[in-house]
Amino acid sequence: MKKVTAMLFSMAVGLNAVSMAAKVKASEEQETDVLLIGGGIMSATLGTYLRELEPEWSMTMVERLEGVAQESSNGWNNAGTGHSALMELNYTPQNVDGSISIEKAVAINEAFQISRQFWAHQVERGVLRTPRSFINTVPHMSFVWGEDNVNFLRARYAALQQSSLFRGMRYSEDHAQIKEWAPLVMEGRDPQQKVAATRTEIGTDVNYGEITRQLIASLQKKSNFSLQLSSEVRALKRNDDNSWTVTVADLKNGTAQNIRAKFVFIGAGGAALKLLQESGIPEAKDYAGFPVGGQFLVSENPDVVNHHLAKVYGKASVGAPPMSVPHIDTRVLDGKRVVLFGPFATFSTKFLKNGSLWDLMSSTTTSNVMPMMHVGLDNFDLVKYLVSQVMLSEEDRFEALKEYYPQAKKEDWRLWQAGQRVQIIKRDADKGGVLRLGTEVVSDQQGTIAALLGASPGASTAAPIMLNLLEKVFGDRVSSPQWQATLKAIVPSYGRKLNGDVAATERELQYTSEVLGLKYDKPQAVDSTPKPQLKPQLVQKEVADIAL
């Protein structure tokens, strides 16, 4: 085993050397203030912010595929959830004493409110058009069965009522009520089975690909914005004045050009890690990546689709990563409703759906190989889970579906391969390396280059993530009166928390719902529930989480 590891490592280092040596000779040079690498929602969001903050800055976006929003941002390559912790049970972990921690749920919800405000502002500006084309009201539900899980959901519901962000959530253990909310989930279910559900009417389904296309189309209307498709970054070199020379190859005709940029953003999804490494900044040495893909079962049968209007999330099974929770979702893609169930984890060494099988190997370096090995050794349960997922048969996946849709018929469903999610592995002084769930902005000390690594919650929090990037790399400008005024016009709640302020929460939800054409009714009284039994939990090794 050691010999195999050594051989693979040598190959990886060799591939990196070849990659770095094979610089394309550029025939011309272009200058730009901002270079956006990747045509996904992150680059589109950052470009939209900067267009308002500094309209005179020139921007260039390069994308290796023939169109924008074709990788992870594509509506078919993600679950399309407006992640706000209304139903995702992994955001409310149970403490050892049995109580429920809501800190992460509050943070996720606050972040999504920023996204809603950002999108609403762009609709008012005419940048985003026809909100129904990219965001729709789809109630968010949690659904569990079994005494322990029902008790957990009771405790979760009670805990979330402490936050103004979760007012309006409903709770029920009544079969008839839950059937009214989600008939597809309840029909054919054992009437004696102990079940519970929560439902929040203001949940959303979001087509991030459509948002991306509309944002970039608006940017293209300005003469100082350039979009270059079928263009792949081959090299990044820092200049003496701290600007960057980036070599970009035209994949159609084989030519190349140099782009000289004052600031570079690497928003290339799974490819971001390799490009960050190519930049040579010391901060990149702390990171490695591990790719995990996802599959969904899809139904377009009208009898199924018209019988389900909700996103219904369950609870991850014991020993599985919390984020692997199964869910059966209404999606609205290009104006058409479909139902998805999953995800089922898949494995490929590609960092992108349209990537190379050598991606994982070529990102392995002398700096990150040890953290990767530590993560593998310390997370055997995660390895077992991934192996078990890869080995699933068609029958296994169908049986998993029937737990959420008892009357499902095989002929109504097909299997769809969604996008790749590169998980962050970061060097850790104590453990050697840790698997980090979430996204992370990595930048140099000078604030001239930044990359976004990670996968979750991803697109639904693009607006707050890019806001964080602005604060990190343009700190002096962000603190200026001009930028402060503009940012508060884009995001009215910027600089303050909505949680705990009922009036402010209702005001922002009312405003964004009206502009985005979403359903919103002021919350009514809290549902009465049986008192949860806060049972002490067994202290178990935490299963590392991953994003699918």
UniProtKB/Swiss-Prot annotation:
Q: Which cofactor does it need?
A: FAD
InterPro entries reported for this sequence: FAD/NAD-bd_sf, MQO
Under catalytic activity, the entry for this protein gives:
(S)-malate + a quinone = a quinol + oxaloacetate
MF terms in GO: 2-hydroxyglutarate dehydrogenase activity; L-malate dehydrogenase (quinone) activity
| Keyword Repressor included in the entry's annotation | no
Q: Which family does it belong to?
A: Belongs to the MQO family.
One Pfam family per UniProt: Mqo
- Class of enzymatic activity (EC top level): oxidoreductase
Species, as recorded? Escherichia coli O127:H6 (strain E2348/69 / EPEC)
Task: Tell me what this protein is called.
Answer: Probable malate:quinone oxidoreductase
What EC number(s) has UniProt assigned to this enzyme? Answer: 1.1.5.4
The biological processes this protein is annotated with in GO are: tricarboxylic acid cycle
Respond yes or no to whether keyword Oxidoreductase is given for this record. Answer: yes
